[in-house]
Swiss-Prot record:
Plays an essential role in the initiation and regulation of chromosomal replication. ATP-DnaA binds to the origin of replication (oriC) to initiate formation of the DNA replication initiation complex once per cell cycle. Binds the DnaA box (a 9 base pair repeat at the origin) and separates the double-stranded (ds)DNA. Forms a right-handed helical filament on oriC DNA; dsDNA binds to the exterior of the filament while single-stranded (ss)DNA is stabiized in the filament's interior. Coiled coil: none annotated. It comes from the Bacteria. Domain I is involved in oligomerization and binding regulators, domain II is flexibile and of varying length in different bacteria, domain III forms the AAA+ region, while domain IV binds dsDNA. InterPro entries: AAA+_ATPase, Chromosome_initiator_DnaA, Chromosome_initiator_DnaA-like, Chromosome_initiator_DnaA_CS, DnaA_C, DnaA_dom, DnaA_N_dom, DnaA_N_sf. One of its GO terms (biological process) is DNA replication initiation. It comes from Bacteroides fragilis (strain ATCC 25285 / DSM 2151 / CCUG 4856 / JCM 11019 / LMG 10263 / NCTC 9343 / Onslow / VPI 2553 / EN-2). Residues 87-130 are annotated as: Domain II. The gene is dnaA. GO terms for molecular function: ATP binding; ATP hydrolysis activity; DNA replication origin binding; lipid binding. It is found in: Cytoplasm. This is Chromosomal replication initiator protein DnaA.
């Protein structure tokens, strides 16, 4: 068929769909769909992301099927061309089903994850599933001040595995800061650059399960031999080995063999080696042989960039004030940020709500642990002045003392971030300053955060105290 034919068919489908869904739903989920081809009773359309595809199949598959049958005829199939990498234009085809949530597979044979890998008898490289998540790559890992060092080291390891001083590479940080993503990204890049290398990603928990099974089945030697054939071993959540003596002993021998034979080890943990309790000293010593790199909690600006990236990759659109609100109020985990995006889209579609600040606030309140009362400028002034060891009245004076000026600027920045007051109002309430002074203060504080880790830490501590103060006030 000609291009006009498949475009025309889809446009007729859109007319029916538009009459059966709210306008906001139509614009969000159907306008971005691009018809590509119609042949053999199959309409092929392109959607902007895997998330987009899964959401359509979950919420609108019946509507799509009935519409296709009405416009084209019974038995018409719908095939999705999912855009998985916008920069390269890479796509993967997915067939519509009644309730499909399929995810693109690597094409490699998979094995029972509980089965001890030693029973595989060291399969050939092309038969070894590295168990990497292809969505966790360097292209989708958003860089900021809090993870810049870790990312740089990770890329160096990926470019030259076991050829740098970063062996082992020990990545640590709180839950949800990107350790698993970065570890997978290393493995994925290595497989791209060195397809003959045997790369394996495994969680510490799964490693323990496999080891226990090998003991039960009297195949421990096979288990150890298998792991000693790996060129790049990635173990996630290594802290789970704590207190498990036999597993630690076995891993110790595997570690030694790999390291002595020029193989790369990448380990992740929720804490630094020095804080790992219940771990043998000889292992802790080896964890520190190479590079220990921390991924800190993402800053507000990084959280905004992570949100923008996810929203763009998923082919969605959020108002900037919604992105800012989410980033400023959800600071525990990147996974929380991504979960909120999905929740907002679901609520918007199911309840026919516009994606606006009100909807975002209602969703975020369900995720954030404690709903706090509104922050006031007086709260901000009191907490800031206490931190700088100043009287609250000092902030309203014309003093040019360094600590007073800095306290005033921090208070203005926090007022801009945590209240709905205009910059003019903020200036009036804090030192009777003008709009331009407040803007300058905000710019100064942001700039100092980017270059001064100590200052950034102080600011985060002040924000934490501010939130605690208002939680306690709200509970009285």
């Amino acid at each position: 068929m000609s291009e006009s034919s498949h475009v025309g068919l889809w446009n007729r489908c859109l007319e029916i769909i538009r009459d059966n869904v709210p306008e906001s739903t139509y614009k969000t989920w159907f306008v971005p769909i691009v018809p590509l081809k119609y042949e053999d009773k199959t309409l092929i359309v392109q959607v902007p992301s895997q998330f987009f595809y899964e959401f359509l199949e979950d919420k609108f598959v019946d509507l799509l099927r009935k519409t296709l049958y009405k416009v084209i005829g019974d038995g018409t199939k719908l095939m999705y061309n999912v855009l998985v990498d916008k920069s390269s234009g890479a796509t993967v085809n997915q067939e519509s089903t009644t309730r499909s949530t399929a995810i693109p597979q690597s094409g490699l044979p998979r094995v029972d994850e509980r089965k001890a890998p030693g029973l595989l008898r060291a399969p050939a490289v092309q038969d070894l599933d590295p168990h990497l998540n292809p969505n966790y790559n360097f292209e989708t890992f958003i860089e900021g001040y809090s993870n810049k060092l870790s990312r740089s080291v990770a890329e160096a390891v990926a470019e030259n595995p076991a050829k740098t001083v970063f062996n082992p590479l020990f990545l640590h940080g709180a839950s949800g800061v990107g350790k698993t993503h970065l570890a997978n990204a290393i493995g994925t890049r290595i497989k791209e650059l060195y397809p003959d290398k045997r790369v394996l990603y495994v969680s510490a928990h799964l490693f323990q399960v496999q080891y226990t099974d090998s003991v039960r089945n009297n195949t421990t030697n096979d288990f150890i031999n298998f792991y000693q054939t790996i060129d790049v071993l990635i173990i996630d959540d290594i802290q789970e080995f704590a207190g498990v003596t036999k597993t630690q002993n076995t891993f110790f021998h595997i570690f030694n063999h790999l390291h002595q034979n020029g193989k790369q080890l990448i380990l992740t943990s929720d804490r630094a080696p020095v804080l790992l309790q219940g771990m043998e000293e000889r292992l802790l010593t080896r964890f520190k042989w190479g590079m220990v790199a921390e991924l800190e909690k993402p800053t507000v600006e990084l959280r905004k960039n992570i949100l923008r990236n996810k929203i763009h990759r998923d082919g969605l659109q959020f108002p900037s004030e919604v992105i800012d609100y989410i980033a400023e109020n959800v600071n525990e985990s990147v996974r929380d940020l991504e979960g909120i995006v999905i929740s907002i889209m679901a609520h918007s579609t199911i309840y026919n709500k516009e994606i606006d600040l009100d909807l975002a606030q209602r969703i975020v309140r369900k995720v954030v642990r404690c709903e706090t009362k509104a922050v006031t400028i007086d709260d901000i002034i009191n907490v800031v002045c206490k931190h700088f060891d100043l009287e609250s009245s000092a902030i309203h004076t014309k003093s040019r003392k360094r600590e007073v000026v800095q306290a005033r600027q921090v208070a203005m920045y926090l007022a801009k971030t945590h209240t709905d007051f205009s910059t003019s109002k903020i200036g009036k309430f804090i030192g009777n300053k003008d709009h331009a002074t407040v803007l300058h203060a905000c710019k100064t504080v942001k700039g100092q955060c980017e270059v001064d880790k100590g200052f950034r830490s102080d600011l985060e501590n002040i924000e934490t105290l501010l939130k605690k103060r208002n939680v306690s006030n709200g509970e009285r």
